[in-house]
């Protein structure tokens, strides 16, 4: 099994992971010690997952963290503030964190992710507003 196969077999046609798969947007899913039998694409080993996250954020131009405190803080800690593009230009890496808990977004900023833009709101509302703004709903 795989996430793309699951999406196809169960006729999934919406959601964040669906959107990433459909539009070929790379993502990293890491499990926790409590996970029981993660999906094939989920890194069960925390060190391997962190390495995959680090590799992906180094290639990113925009990172959006949604409602997972430990993953958000870890991602913020490993996200560079800029990226050198193949043509030599330097551009910023935009880091956004959305969580309903003010503690989470403050912790991200307290840990040194100074270039992060944080929003304290319900992730479902955030996604709805973004989708509406993009004319998707």
Predicted regions span which residues?
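C-terminal functional extensions of proteins
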Residues: 1-63, 68-137
């Amino acid at each position: 099994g795989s996430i793309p196969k699951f999406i196809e077999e169960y006729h999934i046609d919406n959601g964040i992971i669906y959107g990433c798969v459909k539009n070929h947007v790379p993502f990293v899913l890491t499990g926790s010690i409590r996970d029981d039998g993660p999906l094939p694409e989920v890194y069960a080993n925390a060190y391997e997952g962190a390495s995959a996250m680090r590799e992906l954020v180094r290639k990113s131009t925009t990172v959006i963290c949604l409602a997972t405190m430990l993953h958000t803080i870890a991602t913020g800690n490993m996200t560079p503030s800029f990226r050198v593009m193949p043509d030599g230009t330097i551009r910023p890496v935009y880091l956004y964190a959305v969580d309903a808990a003010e503690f989470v977004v403050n912790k991200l900023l307290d840990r040194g992710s100074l270039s992060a833009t944080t929003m304290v709101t319900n992730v479902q509302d955030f996604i709805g507003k973004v989708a509406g703004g993009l004319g998707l709903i």
